[in-house]
């Protein structure tokens, strides 16, 4: 939770492993290191995070994604998209990916094309044609995976043999919507990547 200041304190002061162990163990109070670090209501935070912490199994999740042909990257990885640094404290802590995540940009740059889900056929054609032309000019396309403009942008980029990055909210192993399963498969098989 990069935008959660209390979670940032736990990661900074305790570290990822010790923070997770604190959340997964029965309540035993606030670790001394956290006591003086902020005015957070630690018992309340602990209760808020605990259920998710008990379900978390990063090793299991990573193994599942790796078996599917993906992985997990953090800022220290050379494949980390440096453009995310502009988000400051809201920069993601890591990205799950499925497909090819190159160490250096596979193109001249990236352009985001997003729009309405309930787009007109003319709007869909426009997004597809724009993405196609950008791909032919050496640019990659970034969009979500939604019905409408988003998926048409990916289709155009793939038709132009371009790189495409599909940002998914529900995880790379649960791409949504299901009606785009074949598009997601083509992205991963080509020059595309699903990230979450």
Feature roles, as predicted:
Residues 68-196:
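Glycine-biased, small-residue-rich flexible motifs in mid-sequence functional cores and linkers
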Residues 1-79:
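Short, small/acidic-rich helices and loops at N termini and domain boundaries
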